[in-house]
Regions:
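Blade-level signature of beta-propeller repeat domains, shared across WD40, Kelch, NHL, RCC1
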Residues: 251-280
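Beta-propeller domains
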Residues: 54-76
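Short loop/turn segments that connect beta-strands within beta-propeller blades
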Residues: 73-77, 113-118, 155-159, 191-196, ...
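Bacterial Sec-dependent N-terminal signal peptides
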Residues: 1-27
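Beta-rich, blade/repeat-based domains predominating
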Residues: 37-49, 66-67, 85-100, 126-142, ...
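A short beta-strand motif characteristic of beta-propeller blades
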Residues: 27-34, 78-85, 118-124, 159-165, ...
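Short glycine/acidic-enriched loop and turn motifs that connect beta-strands
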Residues: 58-62, 108, 149-150, 187-189, ...
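Asp-box/WD-like beta-propeller blade repeats and closely related beta-sheet repeat scaffolds
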Residues: 27, 108-139, 144-145
């Protein structure tokens, strides 16, 4: 066998191996709640207790009206308490550190006792207009996005500072290790501890929520009704498109052990669960 034939055979075998390893993904619907969850925007899980915390806007997403709150449901969709926390305005993103639950509430971050649902305190974010998503890193540092001012704020020991500015369309955040993964408009990016940005992928719509799969890949939602699987190197696979049905897909949660997505439907007034199925 000459050198050319050997090289060609090697390339052919490599392609066959790669093709065999290539994976595709799909979603299988598991359940949905009744349409009684009042404009759910974000889901935060406590898998040890089998609980999902759900932010409820309950009305105008920009109104300072005191109607918003946090609900509790089980991981199989049963309602525990629609009024676990009350007295918020238009809460969106949720985060947790220890026994404290954090809720992005327009111009403030509400700190909630996760055992009682009572609001312990509120952290004012100066100049904030539309606080949206929240994530908390392993050290307890809180990051919160402001979609109107294009800023990402950092809260450490109750003190607020600005981490990033001019992030157009900023919404979803997720702290993973020393990196902060960010959805800004159609861009999926990550920032290092100094705020240096690296673009990972360009979506077809404005990103809302994001959750790591556990292998470097991410699940990403667009509010209008799209769920994507995005690989670590930026390849995008569409898992769900409910835009024509006018079923929103807001800030999701993901169980990377059972491979289940929990998706709030905003104006749909319910939470839906899907199984992520991986095939080769």
């Amino acid at each position: 066998m000459n050198k050319f034939s050997k090289h060609f055979l090697s390339v052919l075998m490599s392609f066959a191996i790669y093709s065999g390893l290539a994976q595709t993904h799909k979603l299988e619907k598991l359940w949905e709640t009744d349409t009684i969850v009042r404009v759910p925007e974000s889901v935060l899980p406590d898998f040890k207790k089998g609980i999902l915390y759900v932010s409820e806007i309950d009305g105008n997403p920009n109104a300072v009206d005191g109607k918003g709150g946090v609900a509790k449901i089980t991981v199989d969709g049963k309602i525990i308490d629609l009024d676990f926390t009350t007295g918020l305005n238009a809460p969106k993103g949720l985060g947790r550190f220890g026994n404290e639950l954090y809720a992005a509430d327009l111009s403030e971050v509400a700190v909630i006792d996760i055992n009682t649902g009572k609001i312990k305190s509120k952290i004012a974010v100066d100049s904030a207009k539309a606080l949206n998503d929240i994530t908390v890193d392993a050290k307890g540092i809180v990051y919160v996005s402001d979609s109107k001012t294009k800023k990402i704020h950092r809260i450490e020991n109750g003190k607020v500072s600005t981490f990033l500015t001019n992030v157009a369309g900023v919404n979803g955040l997720k702290a993973v290790g020393d990196e902060l993964f960010i959805l800004g408009g159609q861009k999926f990016m990550k920032a290092d501890s100094r705020g240096n940005l690296t673009q990972i992928a360009m979506l077809s719509c404005g990103g809302d929520g994001l959750e790591p799969v556990g292998n470097g890949d991410f699940l990403i939602t667009c509010w209008a009704g799209h769920i994507f699987y995005v690989t670590a190197d930026g390849k995008i696979e569409t898992l769900l498109d409910t835009q024509e049905k006018k079923v929103n897909t807001a800030d999701l949660a993901y169980d990377n052990i059972k491979h289940i997505l929990y998706v709030p439907t905003f104006w749909g007034n319910k939470v839906m669960a899907y199984k992520l199925i991986t095939t080769k």
